[in-house]
Amino acid sequence: DLRERGLSKERVCRDISEIIAGNTILIAYNAHFDLSFLYYFLLRSGDPDILRGKDKLDLLTVYRDRRPYPHRLLNAIEAYGLGGKVRNSHRALDDVYATLAVMEAMDAEKQDLVQYVDLFGYIPKFGCPGKPIGSVTYRPQTGGRPLYEEGEIAHV
């Protein structure tokens, strides 16, 4: 039974490779964390090069530009009035549905998501989170105007 035995790491890596093959954008809420986790999983059990050349969109960066603290996914769900539509149970599938709903609400609010592709923000007092992703530009997020309009690029 799948629930008892699960899937092999190799099988999961193959499935991930098939899902993100081709011209795919990788979207997440707190994408740096998720992509780092995925990279190291693929490094041990698959091929991390499948992530190379993929566009990346971090909805946490977008949310920080649009709303005051706090910035958890739950806060975004509440801010966009999605509580009756999605759950923030911190379960993988629920998080996927919640992230998709938040992205749709963000796009309906302001159609500038393309400006955030491969642009991740970070809180200056904490610095860049972990090892930088090579294809991503990191900028300190201080508020006031959209991050994509900021001129300062972080040196990481």
Could you say what each language-model-derived stretch is?
Residues 1-45, 50-51, 74-90:
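Conserved non-catalytic scaffold segment of RNase H-like nuclease domains
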Residues 33-34, 69, 98:
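Short phosphate-engaging motifs
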Residues 34, 58, 95:
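Acidic active-site catalytic centers that drive phospho-/nucleotidyl reactions
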Residues 37, 61, 97-98:
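Hydrophobic side chains within alpha-helical segments
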Residues 42-46, 63, 67, 80-84, ...:
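Short, well-ordered alpha-helical segments in soluble proteins
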Residues 55-71:
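Short alpha-helix plus adjacent loop in nuclease-associated cores
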Residues 92-102:
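Alpha-helical transmembrane segments that form the membrane-embedded catalytic/substrate-binding core
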Residues 100-156:
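Acidic two-metal-ion nuclease catalytic site recognized across multiple nuclease folds
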